[in-house]
Amino acid sequence: MSERFSPEQQQLLALAAVFEAAQLADDVAQRGDCDSQAFEALIAGVMELDADNFDGVYSQPGLLREGVSLLSRSLSKDSRGANLRPLNYGLALLHLAGKLRNNEDTVSILRNRLLALSGQQAHFDRFSDDAFCHRIAGIYLDTLGTFRFRIQVKGEPAHLQDDNKAARIRALFLAGVRAAFLWHQLGGRRWHLLFQRKRLISVIESIDINGLR
């Protein structure tokens, strides 16, 4: 169990990690880059296969502030003028994670591929290395990329056609699905976003966002 956060806060922060991945993917698609520390934290979470609580997957929740902010805006009644792209990506990642949960064969393949990559981590300096991102992106394409449901990414053509940037976006989408799995594991459900908005906003307000480390 996490000693820093209540069960509801853990659940909320796991959901925020989904939207953090969505925001970073949009950043890469639009301007070709994203927050490197937040990127590293999300990809590190992908490699934590057996953790059963938030702290076990994300040791630096302070790097998820953008995700918390994006989630907060999406739950508010007045979201006029908000950038809808990352919101749509986040919801799509939740849907994609649901598709994955219902496909045990693909879950098994995904886990085995990640376990194999985990055994080779020493060959990479950082999770943000282009070579590592391509490995993660390849796993995404060979598993989630085989589903009929696809996430349509909008961005600058020069960035979307760049192999390294495209790999980062796919790696972030896999990170978002991993976060969505944790959210579901902690009791999160998509219908909560429709029918428990006030409760979710209350949980967000109970977290000292600026004090997160």
Swiss-Prot record:
Output the Pfam families linked to this UniProt entry: DUF489 (PF04356)
The family database entries (InterPro entries) matched by this protein are listed as: HflD, HflD-like_sf
Bilayer topology term: Peripheral membrane protein
Q: Where's it found, cell-wise?
A: Cytoplasm; Cell inner membrane
Q: Does the keyword Cell inner membrane apply?
A: yes
Alphabetical keyword list: Cell inner membrane, Cell membrane, Cytoplasm, Membrane
Q: What is this protein called?
A: High frequency lysogenization protein HflD homolog
Please list which residues make up the signal peptide.
none
